[in-house]
Amino acid sequence: MSTVAEHVRAAPSSVDRPRTYEVRTYGCQMNVHDSERLTGSLEAAGYVSAEGAEADIVVINTCAVRENADNKLYGNLGHLAGVKRRHEGMQIAVGGCLAQKDRATVLEKAPWVDVVFGTHNMGALPTLLERARHNGEAQLEILESLETFPSTLPTKRDEIASGWVSISVGCNNTCTFCIVPALRGKEKDRRPGDILAEIQALVDDGAVEVTLLGQNVNSYGVEFGDRQAFGKLLRAAGAIEGLERIRFTSPHPAAFTDDVIDAMAETPAVMPQLHMPLQSGSDRILKAMRRSYRSERFLGILDRVRTRVPDAAITTDIIVGFPGETEEDFQETLRVVEAARFSSAFTFQYSIRPGTPAATMEEQVPADVVKERYGRLTALQERISHEENQRVVGRTVEVLVSAHEGRKDGDTRRVTGRAQDGRLVHLDVPEGSAEPRPGDAVDVEVTRAAPFHLIADSVDGAPLRIRRTRAGDAWERAQADSCGVPTPATGASAGAAPRVSLGLPTLRVPTTASTSAPVGDGSAHPRHRA
């Protein structure tokens, strides 16, 4: 193991002050969710947020889906090397999918990194940091399989009103462009009772909205032999008192069945929103991607959803420039996008990911061709997004106010949140009106539309119609009591046989106890975007 003695001097003792941390997140909602668990684990071990100041510990939670993820990581690590030289006792940790994939390469390229951990052992981070600090030596720990389910780790949620709930981890699909199954393993499903208990715990903690997470949520139940388990789970979650909004991501078109559409339509708490990855509109390219569906099936799913859930906002993922993609293939993608009328799309230029079947395919598309096609696709989708948003102008929508969505709210006297269909809404607070708290719900009339958001300006200066919620109450309590930290749960006894723990999470528990709690063995912590 490489030494980091030349990069790390002894850190200040924790009796002087708690050490501070910052978690930087790249990638999907799974990673956002994982970062909440990393944050919770650090706070359970006595670390405190740097709150924008220069941190003693910087944790980078990485993504491996695109080539620029590597460039972004090593660019950030290069910058942090200079910071670390002047910041006594600073530590740097790299985790997530890219760490799982590259392993020792991270330390070879950036020997000033203190800890490298993977997707299967997030709960070990506090222990690895303490070990690296004590030994003056970098710690590399990558596990090949999941030991503790992520949802059982302590958590610190960014949004009190909303929470992520993992229903499964891993993926059984074999898409030729995707590295995720190799890094996160085969699908493992949680039991429905554990999921519902976690949702109830989140609601008890103030949440009014949850997003169910999985690499392929509608294959949920495959491990325990119930192919309609996901639809049943939606209905059961919808029966939890106090839970107002349910979302989920991401389904797979090949396994998306009508019982799920029925559950969406018949469960009031399930929001009129669907993220359905297309990837390509060309049947030939879909076959090369091993996507197991074709464009007409995909469009048929959207038609059935819109029949049962009118005005559903449907979003998607699209890859441009997959190996072998011709202009004719790309035109098929444009055709399907025009027909699908997505409210928005996450669009990507294909990049080679070593370790995937697509990386060795012939007919890699030249970068300049990919870039030109990408520009045409994004222009088309931006026009469609604007047109779809304009259809909402004049309607009254309920907005769940967010604490973090708006970036200019202080300058514009607006607050920001999400409508029930997931659209971002900036709403004006008229002079003299009460201001909604994060977590409160506000009924507003949409007055303007842009491609990526809606605006609700006051037309008559009347006070906002605010519905105060339990989530707003919880936010207010959190503002008054900012010393709460997650409490770690206990794991199996030493020497027990390895297994995957599928238990429940530990949520925020306000306490007046010292935040310099001893660091325990990471394997003893039960565990909880992507």
Curated annotation (Swiss-Prot):
The enzyme's E.C. designation: 2.8.4.3
InterPro entries for this protein: Elp3/MiaA/NifB-like_rSAM, Methylthiotransferase, Methylthiotransferase_CS, Methylthiotransferase_N, Methylthiotransferase_N_sf, MiaB_methiolase, rSAM, rSAM_horseshoe
Residues holding [4Fe-4S] cluster 2: 171, 175, 178
Note describing how the cofactor binds: Binds 2 [4Fe-4S] clusters. One cluster is coordinated with 3 cysteines and an exchangeable S-adenosyl-L-methionine.
Residues the record lists as binding [4Fe-4S] cluster 1: 28, 63, 97
A Pfam family recorded for this sequence: Radical_SAM
MTTase N-terminal domain sequence ranges: 19-134
Protein's UniProt keywords contain Iron: yes
PROSITE patterns listed in its UniProt record: MTTASE_N (PS51449), MTTASE_RADICAL (PS01278), RADICAL_SAM (PS51918), TRAM (PS50926)
Job description of the protein: Catalyzes the methylthiolation of N6-(dimethylallyl)adenosine (i(6)A), leading to the formation of 2-methylthio-N6-(dimethylallyl)adenosine (ms(2)i(6)A) at position 37 in tRNAs that read codons beginning with uridine.
Assembly information from the UniProt record: Monomer.
Protein name: tRNA-2-methylthio-N(6)-dimethylallyladenosine synthase
Organism (species): Clavibacter sepedonicus (Clavibacter michiganensis subsp. sepedonicus)
Gene giving rise to this polypeptide: miaB
